[in-house]
Amino acid sequence: YLWENRLMKNIVPYIHEQFPDQDIEFITGNNDTDLYSYFKEHDELPDIITVRRFSGTDAQDLQPYLMDFASYDVVSKYYSYAVQYYKNAEDEIQWLPICGIPQTIIANKTLFDQYGVKIPENYEEYVQACQQFYDNGIKPYSMDLGEDWSNNEIIQAAAIGEFTSLDGIEWRNGAETAVDEVKFDDALWKRIFSETSQFLKDSHFGKEDINIDVDTGIQMFAEGKSAMFHGHPTVMQQLQKQMDAELIRIPYFSQTSDESYVYMTPSLNIAFNKNLEKDREKLDTALDVLDCMISEEGQKLIADGSGVISLNTDVPTMMQDVPGLEEEINNNAVYIRYSAQKSFDASLEAVHGLLSGEMDEIQAYDTLRSVMNRKAPEEKATVNFENEYSISLNDRNGRDAASSILTTIREENDAQLALAPYYYFTSSIYKGECTNSRVGMMTAKSSDTALYVAKI
């Protein structure tokens, strides 16, 4: 199972080329471990599963059913910093990250030069640069704070010195292995929110930024109305094609020292079904697939281009086309983002509270802590499936679950034709009652996955 359809287009053909004699089926999933919990409830946990948004706390219910990589050679191919947050309470490594993507500030160097603004090399200089642009009527930073991932990023990036401190690492290790609730170090998190609030002020973010989505933020930057945006290398490449300007990358700066860091998101996190260990041939194939994915070519395809931070000792980091981060990369000053599922909603509520003026730093911290440990309400079943259909490919009808869903959509729309990409469908249909959220998991969530209906 691959967490998004882009991987079906990029890495799947390469894997099939490497193993032409192996019958390997790939299915698009969703970026949520709940999908795999749903499969496990019906004894259909896939052999290989992947997600991007992940924390050990999100996969607690899957822990008894996942293989421990620690006893296999593949772990020795990873830098120690890359797996430090991947050990569970039993000291097992059930998940592995596959290549990192730098998510840092993208700066319009041409605009910096035009206004005589120095490219910042520490936090103090970043603050000065923001003030100079603000004084000249240019928005310093058009971050898309209407999106949950950017709110998640801004807390960790603003206080990156705290998250990389001994206290921060200790908290992160505990948060990644928490069973019932995530415990918070009040002293640490009050500092984190103090620095988050300061970063928002220093960057001249305000209430209006709550409504800036990714398209608006990009447009402001592309039109020269803001001096900085943020994103991964592919975003920078796309912007460079649109803009008649020189773009460079700026790392995130610690507010407590002169250190700077690359904020990094794993392209995906991967786990194996424990049952693979009962079938040596299947396990060897799965390990071969993993080796293929962490190879140099595999990482390029997964990361979709240049700007790949290799997490493996035998594969070089591919950052030749991503200037501005050389020192941080050479020093391994790389921070792997915390991406527990609940942290995105929690960050959005807290940061929006600060921006709107409705919360002070303490209230924002209390809100984040509350949302992180909020228990999900028990969901009632909304539909009862009378029949069962598999998502697996068969020789007769293709994918029965996909056919059933698409036929239902066609009939509900009184249409003669319904058309969708094969990777639109993610899950089998299981007989019996099902909740609305589980029904929602049966189709992919990628924005470029279109569905068409037509009356003929």
Q: What label would you give each PLM region?
A:
Residues R52-T104, K118, V127, I154-Q156, ...:
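Hinge/lid segment of periplasmic solute-binding proteins
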Residues S37-K40, P46-D47, V75-L111, K139-P140, ...:
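A structural signal for short loop-to-beta-strand junctions that line the ligand-binding cleft
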Residues D113, Q299, T313, E327-P421, ...:
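Conserved C-terminal helix/tail region of periplasmic/extracytoplasmic solute-binding proteins
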Residues D68-S80, Q84, E162-R191, K241-Q242, ...:
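Short, solvent-exposed loop/beta-turn-alpha elements that line the ligand-binding surface or hinge
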Residues Q132, G174-I210:
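Glycine-centered hinge/linker elements that transmit conformational signals in sensory
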Residues Y1-G56, I119, I362-Q363, S370-E411:
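Conserved N-terminal structural module of periplasmic/extracytoplasmic solute-binding proteins
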Residues E17-Q18, Q114-Y115, Q240-D304:
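Extracytoplasmic/periplasmic substrate-recognition and gating elements
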Residues Q94, V127-D180:
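Extracytoplasmic/periplasmic solute-binding protein
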